[in-house]
From Swiss-Prot:
Destroys superoxide anion radicals which are normally produced within the cells and which are toxic to biological systems. GO terms for molecular function: manganese ion binding; superoxide dismutase activity. The gene is SODA. The keyword Transmembrane does not apply. This is Superoxide dismutase [Mn], mitochondrial. Belongs to the iron/manganese superoxide dismutase family. The keyword Chloroplast does not apply. It comes from Nicotiana plumbaginifolia (Leadwort-leaved tobacco). It comes from the Eukaryota. Its EC number is 1.15.1.1.
Length: 228
């Protein structure tokens, strides 16, 4: 997996092991959204959604694919410094693609159930782990508002402990960077590009309103798959 590939001079020198890992890396493509750009209004404006998807997410995809191509070339030439440099680009842009692909699924228009409280086993798990849905939302909003710079706030599940967790990650680091057993259920993008056109510098208002279009049905499906 691109985000876990560690490049070293020793790996490059031996060659075979890293080349086998490299074969598992694939180029990415921009996924279609399951709704129109304006379908999440007024919580998230159509202008933001279009810019976020077509420009920002597309840039992560383009830069990842470019870095992957350059990595293949550097490996073939035995260029260890370039390989090490490209690892950072692959991690950042690959994380950007993975995180945003989850983010789009985490949202749904109100007419399609966006904002409806979680049902089933996830609803029970939230009450057990946090006391109530309101307490969970309050904690995630506080974590997201307090995050310095750019990053993400996540609701995840530890698939071994069967326990819900709230985590933040910096920049485009995915949730798995906080633990190999963590699976994302919901991720909220708190980069300024996710809200600034509409909410200016008032991130708490964005965090408050995004719950009105949260796709808890999707989150519950992931939870039940990981914790049957």
């Amino acid at each position: 997996m691109a985000l876990r590939t560690l490049v070293s001079r020793r790996t490059l020198a031996t060659g075979l092991g890293f080349r086998q890992q490299l074969r598992g890396l694939q180029t990415f493509s921009l996924p279609d959204l399951p709704y129109d750009y304006g379908a999440l209004e007024p919580a998230i404006s159509g202008d933001i959604m279009q810019l976020h998807h077509q420009n920002h997410h597309q840039t992560y995809v383009t830069n990842y694919n470019k870095a992957l191509e350059q990595l293949h070339d550097a490996i073939s030439k035995g260029d260890a410094p370039t390989v090490a440099k490209l690892h950072s680009a692959i991690k950042f842009n690959g994380g950007g693609h993975i995180n945003h692909s989850i983010f789009w699924k985490n949202l749904a228009p109100v007419r399609e159930g966006g904002g409806e409280p979680p049902k089933g086993s996830l609803g029970w798990a939230i009450d057990t782990n946090f006391g109530s849905l309101e307490a969970l939302v309050q904690k995630m909003n506080a974590e997201g508002a307090a995050l310095q710079g750019s990053g993400w706030v996540w609701l995840g599940v530890d698939k071994e402990l069967k326990r819900l967790v709230i985590e933040t990650t910096a920049n485009q680091d995915p949730l798995v960077s906080k633990g190999a057993n963590l699976v994302p259920l919901l991720g909220i993008d708190v980069w300024e590009h996710a809200y600034y056109l509409q909410y200016k510098n008032v991130r708490p208002d964005y965090l408050k309103n995004i719950w009105k279009v949260m796709n808890w049905k999707y989150a519950n499906e992931v939870y039940e798959k990981e914790c049957p």
